[in-house]
């Protein structure tokens, strides 16, 4: 019996025991903080309508309050006291829109207005719509997917401070408090159950995977114009009958996940800035990249990034190389020169308007994404063909809300070329990606549900043509959000047509439930089925219909620092897929997240 317990510990369940005490301790601390914060001055949650801005998450939905001021005014006014609130009062909890699942999902539940003291967004004006994701930093609410996107400068005002751990969010170093540091930390534990991993091609029997991630960051602001940010991260992974941990994305000794300098100021009527170093990049639609949600080591990039914000228009330019995490030794991550992302993203906010008694806001985004990949592949008639690729991807996205209708629609065309390995033949590329999500928000119903439909058309190639013919398969190599189409990641966003209902609702102010049932076909039967956007399965089925993927995700924000979520999906593979070697199966994911 003792040996059995020891084997389970080695398999990965043992590491779960260590974080339990950490989670319990954090919950107690957080509860204490909430109890103290019950009398902390907050902006009245019943703020005037002029202080409320409708928020969306990449074409998704969330109404939260956002107060910004011109750069020459103080952004930290003394806050009016609100009514006393208990630890479990949902008004004291940050909105769920800062969760990575929400950021990646094609629609996000509508949230009731929250006090601005529970938002830590930068001075981005109308682009703080969408919980800040419209600004290009990922979602930013109480916390952010990208920790340096949080703005805690309001704590410069003594009346906004409390006695909780938030004191570590604003540590001044000079009398004027213009030089200060913000500390952050995160622990995440994920538990995966795959009944038939990779449609049964990876594991025929159930796989149990367990992952742990620790990170700690320090954000040093030196006056108004300079900031230095550094973040350390470590990840572990284990389980029973587990798979897929090679390459450094799941198991990593402690290393520098981010380290950059930013210089910013005001010029030509805009807030401008430049960043150089290693950083997380999320200024792209969730169906292009969401930073890689599942692996313990998210994507980080090395290079340059510049941005400018005007009143209704912003632009972001970037030239980045992916961090190489393959070395298992601590502090040995390096620039991955073989993988490059470059381009520009622009967004224009149309004037706000009223429709059906609802405040409405629409954004028009135009972008260009360039990829250079030294290691890539396309499917052949019997197996995959290794090589390298260059892709140019211009696109447009129009999203927002018009009254009760909430929508996101986009189109991308992709050119470039693919060259087979060992100086093999070169093929030109011409591919496309069309998508649309439309929902109606029943704002007066219980849980304020949004009921809609999502559809995608992503082109595929023809593996039966000659080795020099034009390739039509669309490529999204940087891990689109798992919550966009398929939580189990059994199907990738290439050679896909999908359509299905989407329902989002908020049973309580600190819980969310998302339901969807996409039905998936191949765009063309002349191309393979993909398990991610850049790798195809080896089986070659007949027929276009691939699978039906009913799935759900429930999230509970227990305290300001502690969040639990559980997602489930069943892959009903088509008869043609099963006959070619695939299997149907269940997928379950549980997550515990502690954020400071």
Task: For every predicted segment, state its role.
Residues 193-212, 220-269, 287-290, 328, ...:
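Surface-exposed loop and membrane-interface regions of Gram-negative outer-membrane beta-barrel proteins
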Residues 187-195, 232-238, 278-282, 310-312, ...:
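Transmembrane beta-strands of outer-membrane beta-barrel pores
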